[in-house]
Regions:
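Hydrophobic transmembrane alpha-helices and their immediate loop junctions
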Residues: 1-189
């Protein structure tokens, strides 16, 4: 154990670690009751969230250093120099991964009978209600939550679109002028 973390496994060389507070957080989340399906489900939701960040980190050519799971959430550790848009997209990666689980889980919850197994019922609760609550919580625009870096994505994209539009306007008259000159040359010859 290193600084309270135990390396569970590695994904492409990237360590996935659990902190000693993980069981404590699970117990608090379930209100002190024995709820192994909820515990496993929330662990999977948090792990999926962090993997979502890691996927975007990898996609942008940055370096994944590790995924840490604690009793109070998780953390994707990475290094590199992303653009503002990339940093915001990485922040959205966790929530997008959670949504990829939430949508089909809601379909199961809405259209299939409730599981008879307490473990499966708790697991479904973790994948739906608890997952939705964690998504909403993570999107609060306050550091260290993802919302602090995720929501600015729309402002970055709007500014980027305005810059592209400005360049198009500068280039369009020149392009039109060149096209007219070309047409005149063809008509004269």
């Amino acid at each position: 154990m290193e600084r309270g973390y135990l390396t569970l496994f590695r994904v492409r060389g990237v360590p996935v670690r659990a902190h000693w507070t993980l069981p404590l957080g699970a117990l608090l989340l379930s209100g002190g009751r024995f709820a192994p399906g909820l515990w496993v489900g929330v662990l999977l939701v948090v792990a999926l969230h962090e993997l979502g960040h890691a996927l975007f980190v990898h996609r942008f050519g940055l370096v994944n250093l590790g995924l840490d799971l604690t009793g109070f959430g998780g953390r994707c550790r990475w290094a590199g120099h992303p653009s503002e848009v990339q940093r915001a997209a990485i922040a959205w990666g966790g929530v997008l991964a959670q949504l990829a689980l939430l949508i089909p889980a809601l379909g199961v919850a809405l259209f299939l009978p409730m599981p008879r197994s307490p473990f499966l019922a708790e697991l479904l609760e973790a994948f739906t209600r608890t997952n939705a609550i964690l998504i909403a919580f993570n999107l609060i625009p306050i550091k260290p939550l993802d919302g602090a870096e995720a929501w600015p994505l729309f402002g970055h994209l709007r500014r980027q679109r305005a810059r592209v539009k400005k360049w198009k306007q500068k280039l369009a008259p020149q392009t039109l002028r060149e096209a007219l000159d070309e047409a005149d040359r063809k008509n004269l010859h």
